C-alpha cells in the first residue's frame, strides 16, 4: 500500500511504480512457484532471478538483475547435486562422481530443464534482447535457472533449495550415468523389453524448438506394454538416450 500511495503522492515514474508493485509477470511467476514446489516468502528474490540485465538497464531507476543470484545458484546447484550423488552411489569413484555431476549441471542439461519448467515465460527481458530472440536463448535460460536456485536458497535455506533441485533434476539422474556405463541406454532398454515383453521399444520424435544454433529435440519412447517416457535433448540421439535412461531406471527397480 505504501508503494501505491508514494507513487500517487510524489508522482514517481511509472518504472518505479512497477518496481514498487512488482506486478509484472505475476501469472507466469506464480505458475513457476507451483511447478518447482516452492512458495517464496520474499517475492523480490524470485523476480530478481527472472530479471535479465537488459531489462534492468532500460529502467529509469537502478534495478537489480540476476547475475549475482546466478553466481550463488551455480554453487548451490553443484553442492546439492554433489551431495545427492555421494549418497546415491557410495561405491562410485571420484572420477565417476565428477563425470556424473558434470553431465547433470552442464549448460545443455540446465537448458533442457529450464525449457521443461517454461522458464522463458517468467523472464523479464529488455526490448533489444527480446527482439533478438533472447527468450529462446539456451544460455540465458540456464543462467536464469541457476539464479532461481540462488533465490530459493536465500529465501528458505539449503534444505528448501535441495528439495527444488531434486524435484526438477531428480528425473535426470539416471541420464548422468550414460557416459559412465559401458553400454548405452538404448541397447539396455532393448535388451530389457525383449526379455520382459518379447518386443522392442518404439521411439518417436515429437518435435523440436529453438533457433538453429541451439535446437532442442523432444522424443518419446513407448514400451511394448504402453508405458511412455519422454525427454528433451540437444540432439535427437541424445534425447533418445535420455528417454531410454528413464525407462531403464523404472524397469530396473
UniProtKB/Swiss-Prot annotation:
Q: Localized where?
A: Cytoplasm
Q: Name one GO molecular function term.
A: ribonuclease III activity
- The EC number(s) attached to this protein equal 3.1.26.3
GO BP terms in the entry: mRNA processing; regulation of gene expression; rRNA processing; tRNA processing
Task: List cofactor names only.
Answer: Mg(2+)
List, for all copies, the residue spans of the domain called DRBM: 184-253
Q: Which reaction does it catalyse?
A: Endonucleolytic cleavage to 5'-phosphomonoester
What PROSITE patterns does this protein map onto? DS_RBD, RNASE_3_1, RNASE_3_2
Positions in coiled-coil regions: none
Per UniProt, Mg(2+) binds at 70, 143, 146
Q: Which UniProt keywords apply?
A: Cytoplasm, Endonuclease, Hydrolase, Magnesium, Metal-binding, mRNA processing, Nuclease, RNA-binding, rRNA processing, rRNA-binding, tRNA processing
A Pfam family annotated for this chain is Ribonucleas_3_3
Cellular component per GO, a single term: cytoplasm
The keyword Metal-binding belongs to this UniProt entry's keyword annotation:
yes
State the InterPro entries in the record.
dsRBD_dom, RNase_III, RNase_III_dom, RNase_III_sf
Where is this protein primarily located?
cytoplasm
Question: What positions does the domain RNase III occupy?
Answer: 29-157
Record bears the keyword Protein biosynthesis: no
SMART domains tied to this protein: DSRM, RIBOc
Catalytic residue list: 74, 146
- Subunit structure of this entry? Homodimer.
Which function does this protein serve? Digests double-stranded RNA. Involved in the processing of primary rRNA transcript to yield the immediate precursors to the large and small rRNAs (23S and 16S). Processes some mRNAs, and tRNAs when they are encoded in the rRNA operon. Processes pre-crRNA and tracrRNA of type II CRISPR loci if present in the organism.
Q: What family is this protein classified in?
A: Belongs to the ribonuclease III family.
Q: What is this protein called?
A: Ribonuclease 3
State the taxonomy lineage.
Bacteria, Pseudomonadati, Thermodesulfobacteriota, Desulfovibrionia, Desulfovibrionales
Amino acid at each position: 500500500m505504501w508503494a501505491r500511495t508514494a507513487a500517487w503522492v510524489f508522482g514517481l515514474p511509472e518504472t518505479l511504480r512497477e518496481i514498487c508493485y512488482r506486478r509484472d509477470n505475476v501469472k507466469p511467476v506464480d505458475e513457476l512457484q507451483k511447478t518447482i514446489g516452492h512458495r517464496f516468502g520474499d517475492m523480490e528474490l524470485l523476480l530478481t532471478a527472472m530479471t535479465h540485465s537488459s531489462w534492468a538497464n532500460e529502467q529509469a531507476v537502478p534495478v537489480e538483475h540476476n547475475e549475482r543470484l546466478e553466481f550463488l545458484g551455480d554453487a548451490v546447484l553443484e553442492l546439492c547435486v554433489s551431495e545427492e550423488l555421494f549418497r546415491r552411489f557410495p561405491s562410485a569413484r571420484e572420477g565417476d562422481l565428477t563425470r556424473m555431476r558434470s553431465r547433470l549441471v552442464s549448460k545443455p542439461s540446465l537448458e533442457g530443464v529450464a525449457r521443461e519448467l517454461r522458464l522463458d515465460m517468467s523472464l523479464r527481458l529488455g526490448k533489444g534482447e527480446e527482439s533478438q530472440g533472447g527468450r529462446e536463448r539456451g544460455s540465458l535460460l540456464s543462467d536464469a535457472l541457476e539464479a532461481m536456485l540462488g533465490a530459493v536458497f536465500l529465501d528458505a535455506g539449503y534444505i528448501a533449495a535441495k528439495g527444488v533441485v531434486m524435484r526438477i533434476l531428480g528425473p535426470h539422474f539416471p541420464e548422468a550415468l550414460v557416459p559412465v556405463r559401458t553400454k548405452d541406454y538404448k541397447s539396455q532398454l532393448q535388451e530389457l523389453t525383449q526379455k520382459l515383453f518379447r518386443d522392442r521399444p518404439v521411439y518417436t520424435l515429437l518435435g523440436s524448438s529453438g533457433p538453429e544454433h541451439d535446437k532442442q529435440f523432444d522424443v518419446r519412447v513407448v514400451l511394448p506394454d504402453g508405458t511412455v517416457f519422454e525427454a528433451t535433448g540437444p540432439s535427437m540421439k541424445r534425447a533418445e538416450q535420455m528417454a531410454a535412461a528413464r525407462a531403464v531406471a523404472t524397469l530396473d527397480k
